[in-house]
Amino acid sequence: MNANLRRWMALVVVCFGQLMIMLDSTIVNVALPYIQRDLGFSQANLTWVVNAYLIAYGGFLLVAGRVGDLIGRRKVFLAGVFLFTVASVGSGFSQGADNLIVGRFLQGLGGSLSAGVIIAIIVTEFQRPAERAQAMSVFTLVIAGGGSLGLLAGGFLTEWINWHWIFFINLPIGVATLVLGAWLIEENEGLGLSQGVDLLGAVLITASLMLGVYGIVTATDYGWTSPHTLGLVGAALGLLAVFVLLESRLRNPLMPMRILGIRSLMGATGARALLFTGLFVNFFVGALYLQHGRGYSAFETGLAFLPTTLMIGVMSSGIAARLMARVGPRNLLMAGLAGIVAALTILSNAGPAAGYAPVLLAAYVLLGAGAGSSFLPLLTISMSEVPLRDAGLGSGFSNVVMQVGGALGLASITSISTSHAQGYAAFQMAYVLAALCVAAALVVVLAVLRTRNTDVVIREQAPVEEAA
């Protein structure tokens, strides 16, 4: 096969792997009321259907990228797709809440293995700047549209078949990705296991995150100042402190401390976590609001979010890139975040009697336009000062904070809103808190990301082969 054709087909394969991950990050949202009814979840514990996935995904991203450097990225990618596919089938057969949570955790672990090496595979396959930009545009489109597409697919499958099929749908996609990936993706020469894998660091950070989220999720039942909540959160902070101490002393740490000194990466990563908190809350709470508060079916809920999906796709198809070249990434990012704040504010003030059109429709269109305008600038700015030798580490760190921050934010906002309000008022409070999170992201951009509004590129400070 022609080498150039093989590279582009390999890109399609890894994008299918990423699409499967993004679909599954949101496809369960519209099915949550059905899952809650069938498996007996409480309202607070229902967030674990989402958070078990997100915590495992975020907790193992860094170590997945490192293992890919050591033993080969194709091996890790295919292992992740295999585990994700098997866990999806297991989740589909779940007959109890505990079984589903375990399945979702394993899905997150498989997703982290494959996602942790995808960017490194793309960077290695596409070494010329123009080609790499084209490849990353395709990858960004998959990230931007995949999660929203999951809402529509979840609604259709839940309404016309049953909620179990939101997991079974991954089987044909996973099998195709495994077969084509083994054929098309070239293996990199691993550094060897003698370089060391920071498994202790991965265990510490994952345990810290899970304890923290569990403490927040159960705070509604035990109280925010109860020994149960304070003990779990304190243990989480203690494990986090041990993790930081360990990483500062290891020769080959999971997260080298030098990464924390890159201003643009830290600022953009913080803004990204706050942004995705708002988006996670919108899709999670919005699905419950439309079905419980307005009586929508699962499929109708998916259709209600379709304007958001379409606007994200439209903006990510090239419009955002052209606007960024014209006005700069920082200006476009600020406009996008402002649009999301406005959309969430509209949703928080939409009374129970407000019709879908024009109020909710306008909010969902504005939300999609804002999100589609924010993703590419955030990715661009976050990597603008990261040396290419640390590109994988930088992108992995950003993804970890985004996923885990979003999961913690979702758990916190859901817990706070349900403990302080009931019925429609709880939904309203959740939207207000989500809007405040995105507004905080805008403040971070204004205060921290003081980059010039010109094209921002990754600094070519190391050979491509060193990219992690």
Q: Where do the model's predicted regions map?
A:
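Transmembrane-helix bundle of Major Facilitator Superfamily
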Residues: 1-183, 318, 327, 333, ...
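Short loop segments and helix-boundary regions at transmembrane helix junctions
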Residues: 5-8, 128, 184-202, 223-226, ...
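12-transmembrane solute porter fold
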Residues: 8-23, 28-30, 43, 227-239, ...
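Short helix-kink/termination motifs in transmembrane helices of multi-pass secondary transporters
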Residues: 20-31, 56-59, 73, 166, ...
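Interfacial loop-to-helix junctions that mark the boundaries of transmembrane helices
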Residues: 45, 98-106, 162-169, 195-198, ...
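Alpha-helical transmembrane segments
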Residues: 82, 204-209, 338
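C-terminal membrane-cytosol helix-exit motif in multi-pass small-molecule transporters
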Residues: 171-190, 206-218, 235-250, 441-451
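Flexible interhelical linker loops that connect adjacent transmembrane helices
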Residues: 178-206, 248-266, 325, 389, ...
